Amino acid sequence: MDYAKRIGQVGALAVVLGVGAAVTTHAIGSAAPTDPSSSSTDSPVDACSPLGGSASSLAAIPGASVPQVGVRQVDPGSIPDDLLNALIDFLAAVRNGLVPIIENRTPVANPQQVSVPEGGTVGPVRFDACDPDGNRMTFAVRERGAPGGPQHGIVTVDQRTASFIYTADPGFVGTDTFSVNVSDDTSLHVHGLAGYLGPFHGHDDVATVTVFVGNTPTDTISGDFSMLTYNIAGLPFPLSSAILPRFFYTKEIGKRLNAYYVANVQEDFAYHQFLIKKSKMPSQTPPEPPTLLWPIGVPFSDGLNTLSEFKVQRLDRQTWYECTSDNCLTLKGFTYSQMRLPGGDTVDVYNLHTNTGGGPTTNANLAQVANYIQQNSAGRAVIVTGDFNARYSDDQSALLQFAQVNGLTDAWVQVEHGPTTPPFAPTCMVGNECELLDKIFYRSGQGVTLQAVSYGNEAPKFFNSKGEPLSDHSPAVVGFHYVADNVAVR
């Protein structure tokens, strides 16, 4: 019996010595949407459970009792109990101290809904958030009128009590929303693989607080947001097509993106850390690891990322089946993710960068996206943005077929030209009349109704002080009005 006990203790020692668990990306879910394990429903209880799990039995390693020639065997019975237990306790303490540092988990923020009388104040209301590792959290809400901030009231955050007070504007009755960014960047720790390859990733989660002013919670929640798509010319300078040095101007692009609710960027290859340096957008997709290994990793990156005031989840990256010539030097493709609106329902968001040149290869890229949408977004609200490298006037253009087969509407066509697609729109860079290579398609779906209410070619807002563009593309923005089911009252 004593010998078996010693074997168990030695086995425990071996288990404790296995300090590292498999490194995982906690910044955002990366399972394919068809993977049953990648449910879009968050599980804050599981996410905030204590480190460790249920106790499991420990057994000796099979074959450990077989002597090896020339190797002295250690009799477990010769190891004093006190020494062995002290060693196990010491190594367990080391492990428990290291894991929260080298394998920290992202905090969890949950959506909230509160009611306040007309012209009244509610609070302090504690934020519904937790940190699985017990790290101190900070809370940030953007100023009134800013994207993601309250539009019809003032929010005051108390970091000490992890709570907020909301004061409604006089005379306003209706629904107001704001996003809260929850961060555990208050101590030295790393969030898995995302943290090792990008020190700014993995610390944050974001949730929406919905405020019903002068009324009770409703079955639906409506609001507005802006969606921008922008090819930021992020190849290493001077390979980039943009005429300006990329370090400084990529940082300037990131700063100016704060004026929008959601931004899908393409060619975010080599300067991602500069792009997010001045960003206030709390939900950001972690770049593919090679993007941080500039310039070696550039050929292995798709350059596609999303920055958002709404929570973005379930990221899936897909590369093109077909490419031609220099298009094959980088892993162009598309991303799929879900954007959570106030009320809890989600929109499927696609961000793409097709092959240049148009024709069969570009059309094959669009067919690949269409097939993916049909398999993974059936019946759901969808927004597709990106650098399509195609115009309606191009020979063999498949843009019309792409829209029709997926039930999508081109927001530029709808807002600027009514229901008719212009066959020969000007290809200028400045002006809403210009047909850009960069497009935004959308459709409504179960639980979410979308309507494009405005379109803008934002090129003048992305010039430097000399009137030079920060990229060789013009960013396009669409203002959306949404009506989403309130899942909290279903």
Swiss-Prot record:
Q: Where is this region: Disordered?
A: 30-49
Gene Ontology biological process terms from the UniProt entry? acquisition of nutrients from host; hemolysis in another organism; monoatomic ion transport; sphingomyelin catabolic process; transmembrane transport
Alphabetized Gene3D superfamilies for the sequence: 2.60.40.3440, Endonuclease/exonuclease/phosphatase
According to its UniProt record, which reaction does this protein catalyse? a sphingomyelin + H2O = phosphocholine + an N-acylsphing-4-enine + H(+)
The record's note on what follows loss of this gene reads: Cells lacking this gene do not grow on sphingomyelin as a sole carbon source anymore and replicate poorly in macrophages indicating that M.tuberculosis utilizes sphingomyelin during infection. Moreover, deletion of this gene reduces lysis of erythrocytes by twofold compared with wild-type.
Which enzyme class? Answer: hydrolase
Membrane topology field: Multi-pass membrane protein
* pH dependence (record): Is most active at neutral pH.
**Any one cellular component term from GO for this entry?**
cell outer membrane
Please state, per the UniProt record, what induces or represses the expression of this protein. Answer: Rv0888 protein levels are increased by 5-fold after contact with erythrocytes for 24 hours, and by 100-fold in the presence of sphingomyelin as the sole carbon source.
Question: What's a single GO MF annotation on this record?
Answer: transmembrane transporter activity
Where are the bilayer-spanning segments? 137-145, 162-168, 172-182, 188-196, 205-213
Q: Where is the signal peptide?
A: 1-31
Cell location:
Cell outer membrane
- Record text about domains: Consists of a surface-exposed C-terminal sphingomyelinase domain and a putative outer membrane-spanning N-terminal channel domain able to mediate glucose and phosphocholine uptake across the outer membrane.
Q: What does this protein do?
A: Catalyzes the cleavage of sphingomyelin, a major lipid in eukaryotic cells, into ceramide and phosphocholine, which are then utilized by M.tuberculosis as carbon, nitrogen and phosphorus sources, respectively. Thus, enables M.tuberculosis to utilize sphingomyelin as a source of several essential nutrients for intracellular growth during infection. Furthermore, lyses erythrocytes and constitutes the main hemolytic factor of M.tuberculosis.
Q: Could you identify this protein by its name?
A: Sphingomyelinase
Q: Which organism is it from?
A: Mycobacterium tuberculosis (strain ATCC 25618 / H37Rv)
Its gene name is spmT
